[in-house]
């Protein structure tokens, strides 16, 4: 029985030590932690546009973009791994909408060619030869009949008058209605709404930077061979992207960015291949013919810019590509494609004419206002590439009516441009498609295009937008001191916004040291970006009236302030306003962190990793913090109601004394009134019983028993406990008597309370003494148990050592004895041999 009780006490002691040793953690709020989450937001653009330029890109950029930052900042994030996915990048979709806006804004004031959807009589036209020495051989795929000279009736300035006008059209831009009577119409009249480009419109792309609004950041992957989809370990944060030239083209990527580490091929796991080179291949395109442009009035205030006459070869447009530079890059690209697709049996060829629109089957781009359509068979067909000399010449067509890529069912009429046109660009990549899955024997790879979003994905593959989440919660060892009023600290302004994420790769313990600086950086970064936006808006307010981008930039400004105010409102609801580290009274639940130890959290995890671990419980934690703060507010309200007890000295003020006198008068008046009422009631009761009232000055002795003698002069005799009741007269005597009785009553009650308190303290002291005695006995008993078990363990160890020593000694003796026998046997071998020989001789 004693042994069982000893084990029970030992178990209780161990449990007590375990409970005491386990440290309670509390939810702690941190403001300014380097945490971000993927987000979608409206980016704003920045460019070095020239307001005095009439070029379409400059006009649009002046109205839509802010000036670029002369000192762009980039902050590296060490020890950070981030996932990117270029195929789901919303930045590319936004850029697509922006470039559509650019084109539509450029064409907004131009004339719609609906009045030209009439029947036209057309004949072949070949242009005027300048001289035979300057003529070059026409390419077979261009055709000899290039132009149609068409006549049609057009409305004059007076709507009821018509006149016959003439104009030259390219063969591809008109469709025969009746081949017998040579009637034609424009190719887009029955399918699209055709808009005539303004005569002075030119498309010369300028670099455009996309920037994140305040409260957001742009993550950038700096790995040279990054495929655009997956994890990136070399990450930095920037405010704006690099300058992107919005060049519209198909098949070839012109004037894009280069890769720093070889050729990279990006596959969307369907059929698209985006190729990015690390070297450029120049392409020089020329239209040497000299168009003579004219204008035809087709209605009131409507002018159609047509081609009156062409001098020289009407379609001698071509592009030259250096075979010495193209061939090695194309061969390296083909080898990389074979590695990506995991096949060697791949056919590379150009598209046939019947495999899609001209924009897809040909290289389409804009050169100084003219739309070129070039045949790229000599670039992609191996047999033609081997036959081609230096340089590779691509025959090109020029179209006046073009299917716009911006909207389905929309076309553009590009007015003729006078003079010689020449454009030099750099090929930086390819847009390819392949047919045939992994189970097919043959795979065909051919150039493609048309989906301009792929061009922007190729430029924005290494970027993504994230929102800054500066509020974080984590377990802490400190608990908030309840019901105390503290001074609130105010934030100052600090360095740069991007520096806020500079501690992203640090552990939580290291990053929490710089929370004040990071919080200041966050606010100052918002203020800095607001100032940049505001200056840009003020400088361009007369231009922003023409564009919705002014509203978008103002929305970005308001959004940042709203996000900051929202965070401050949340902190205020939690009682953490103005604090970078705020302790709470909410106990930390270990299940929220998947039972991760306290030291592991603060020494091994970054804030971003910690946020991913507890993100699912954020709502629960925030709700508990808010409930705890509501309870804290209730407690503070109760305390403030008793706050006057903190200033006892104010009790002696003249105002208080007047209040005390008033209360005393009211109490005395009440007592006197009650006394008078009680006397009146007593007199009335006695009168009803037949007695007359005695004088109030008469002392009425109390009645004695007949057998009790009265008290003598010496004080002998039985003294009755009763006393004469004196009836006082007068107001002062009555008040004094009542106050005397009240004070005597209070004195007796106070004496009784002190006696009870003393008795309680005596009992408490006895209980405490008894408890200490029991604790001492428990300690003695536990010490005895520990001594007993220590002695038992020592005896067992000694016995074990003795037994081991005996066994070892016996074993050693046996081994020695066995060795001696073997040794004696070996020594006796010669003697045994000698004895054997002696017996043999006998």
Curated annotation (Swiss-Prot):
Residues 685-842 are cytoplasmic. Disulfide bonds join 45-65, 110-198, 117-189, 122-150, 211-240, 221-232, 285-319, 367-423, 374-396, 576-582. Residues 122-149 are annotated as: V1. Inhibitors targeting HIV-1 viral envelope proteins are used as antiretroviral drugs. Attachment of virions to the cell surface via non-specific interactions and CD4 binding can be blocked by inhibitors that include cyanovirin-N, cyclotriazadisulfonamide analogs, PRO 2000, TNX 355 and PRO 542. In addition, BMS 806 can block CD4-induced conformational changes. Env interactions with the coreceptor molecules can be targeted by CCR5 antagonists including SCH-D, maraviroc (UK 427857) and aplaviroc (GW 873140), and the CXCR4 antagonist AMD 070. The gene is env. GO terms for molecular function: structural molecule activity. Belongs to the HIV-1 env protein family. It comes from Human immunodeficiency virus type 1 group N (isolate YBF30) (HIV-1). The record marks 488-489 as: Cleavage. It holds the Pfam family GP120. Residues 24-663 are extracellular. CDD domains: HIV-1-like_HR1-HR2. This is Envelope glycoprotein gp160. Residues 1-23 form the signal peptide. Residues 353-363 are annotated as: CD4-binding loop. The keyword Disulfide bond applies. Residues 489-510 are annotated as: Fusion peptide. Glycans are attached at residues 79, 123, 131, 134, 149, 153, 181, 190, 225, 229, 234, 255, 267, 278, 284, 290, 320, 331, 345, 375, 386, 422, 426, 589, 594-595, 604, 616. GO terms for cellular component: host cell endosome membrane; host cell plasma membrane; membrane; viral envelope; virion membrane. It comes from the Viruses. A motif (YXXL motif) lies at residues 691-694. HAMAP family: HIV_ENV. Residues 285-318 are annotated as: V3.
């Amino acid at each position: 029985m004693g042994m069982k009780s000893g084990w029970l006490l030992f178990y209780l002691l161990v449990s007590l030590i375990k409970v005491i040793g386990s440290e309670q953690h509390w939810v702690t709020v941190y403001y300014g932690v380097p945490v971000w989450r993927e987000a979608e937001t409206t980016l704003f653009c920045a460019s070095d546009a020239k307001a005095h330029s009439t070029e379409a890109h400059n006009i649009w950029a002046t109205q839509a973009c802010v000036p670029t930052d002369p000192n762009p900042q980039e902050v590296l994030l060490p020890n950070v791994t981030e996932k990117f996915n270029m195929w789901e990048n919303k930045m590319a979709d936004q850029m697509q909408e922006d470039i559509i806006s650019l084109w539509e804004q450029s064409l907004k004031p131009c004339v719609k060619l609906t009045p030209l959807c009439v029947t036209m009589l057309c004949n072949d036209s070949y242009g005027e030869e300048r001289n035979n020495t300057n003529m070059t051989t026409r390419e077979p795929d261009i055709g000899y009949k290039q132009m149609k000279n068409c006549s049609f009736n057009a409305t004059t300035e007076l709507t009821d008058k018509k006149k016959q006008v003439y104009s030259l059209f390219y063969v591809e831009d008109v469709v025969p209605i009746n081949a017998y009577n040579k009637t034609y119409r424009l190719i887009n009249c029955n399918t699209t709404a055709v808009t005539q480009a303004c005569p002075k419109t030119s498309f010369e792309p300028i670099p455009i930077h996309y920037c994140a609004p305040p409260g957001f950041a742009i993550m950038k992957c700096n790995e040279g061979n990054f495929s655009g989809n997956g994890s990136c370990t070399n990450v930095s944060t920037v405010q704006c992207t690099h300058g992107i030239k919005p060049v519209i083209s198909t098949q070839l990527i012109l004037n894009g960015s280069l890769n720093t580490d070889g050729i990279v091929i990006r596959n969307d796991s369907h059929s698209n291949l985006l190729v990015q080179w690390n070297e450029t291949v120049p392409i020089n395109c020329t239209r040497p013919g000299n168009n003579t442009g004219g204008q035809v009035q087709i209605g009131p205030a409507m002018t159609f810019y047509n081609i009156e006459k062409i001098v020289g070869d009407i379609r001698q447009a071509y592009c030259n590509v250096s075979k010495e530079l193209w061939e090695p890059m194309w061969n390296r690209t083909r080898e990389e494609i074979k590695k990506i697709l995991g096949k060697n049996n791949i056919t590379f060829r150009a598209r046939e004419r019947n495999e899609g629109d001209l924009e897809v089957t040909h290289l389409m781009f804009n050169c100084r206002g003219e739309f070129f359509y070039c045949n790229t068979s000599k670039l992609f067909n191996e047999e033609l590439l081997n036959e081609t000399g230096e340089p590779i010449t691509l025959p090109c067509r020029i179209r006046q009516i073009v299917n716009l890529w911006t909207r389905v069912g929309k076309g553009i009429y590009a007015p003729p441009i006078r003079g010689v046109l020449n454009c030099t660009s750099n090929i930086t990549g390819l847009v390819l498609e392949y047919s045939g899955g992994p189970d097919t024997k043959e795979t065909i790879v051919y150039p493609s295009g048309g989906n301009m979003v792929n061009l922007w994905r190729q430029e924005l593959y290494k970027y993504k937008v994230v929102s800054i989440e500066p509020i974080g919660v984590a377990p802490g060892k400190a608990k908030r001191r309840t019901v105390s009023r503290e001074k609130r600290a105010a934030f100052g302004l600090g360095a740069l916004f991007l520096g806020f994420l500079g501690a992203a790769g640090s552990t939580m313990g290291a990053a929490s040291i710089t929370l004040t600086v990071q919080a200041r950086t966050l606010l100052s970064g918002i203020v800095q970006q607001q100032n940049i936006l505001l200056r840009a808006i003020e400088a361009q307010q007369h231009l922003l009236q023409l564009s919705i981008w002014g509203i978008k930039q103002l929305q970005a400004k308001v959004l940042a302030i709203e996000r900051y105010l929202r965070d401050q409102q949340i902190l205020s609801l939690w009682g953490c306003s103005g604090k970078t580290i705020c302790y709470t009274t909410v106990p930390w639940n270990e299940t929220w962190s998947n039972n991760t130890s306290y030291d592991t959290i603060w020494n091994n995890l970054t804030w971003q990793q910690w946020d991913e671990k507890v993100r699912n419980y954020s709502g629960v934690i925030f709700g508990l913090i808010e409930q705890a703060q509501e309870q804290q507010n209730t407690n503070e309200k109760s305390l403030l109601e008793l706050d006057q007890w903190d200033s006892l000295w104010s009790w002696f003020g003249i105002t208080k004394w007047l209040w005390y006198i008033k209360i005393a008068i009211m109490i005395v008046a009440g007592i006197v009134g009650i006394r008078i009422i009680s006397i009146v009631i007593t007199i009335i009761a006695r009168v009803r019983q037949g007695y007359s009232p005695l004088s109030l000055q008469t002392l009425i002795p109390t009645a004695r028993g007949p057998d009790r003698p009265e008290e003598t002069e010496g004080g002998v005799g039985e003294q009755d406990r009763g006393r004469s009741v004196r009836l006082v007269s007068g107001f002062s005597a009555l008040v004094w008597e009542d106050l005397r009785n009240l004070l005597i009553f209070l004195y007796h009650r106070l004496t009784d309370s002190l006696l009870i308190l003393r008795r309680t303290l005596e009992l408490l002291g006895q209980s405490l003494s008894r408890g200490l005695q029991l604790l001492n006995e428990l300690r003695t008993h536990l010490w005895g148990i520990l001594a007993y078990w220590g002695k038992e363990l020592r005896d067992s160890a000694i016995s074990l050592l003795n037994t081991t020593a005996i066994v070892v000694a016996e074993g050693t003796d046996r081994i020695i004895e066995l060795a001696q026998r073997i040794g004696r046997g070996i020594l006796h071998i010669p003697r045994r041999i000698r004895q054997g020989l002696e017996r043999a001789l006998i």
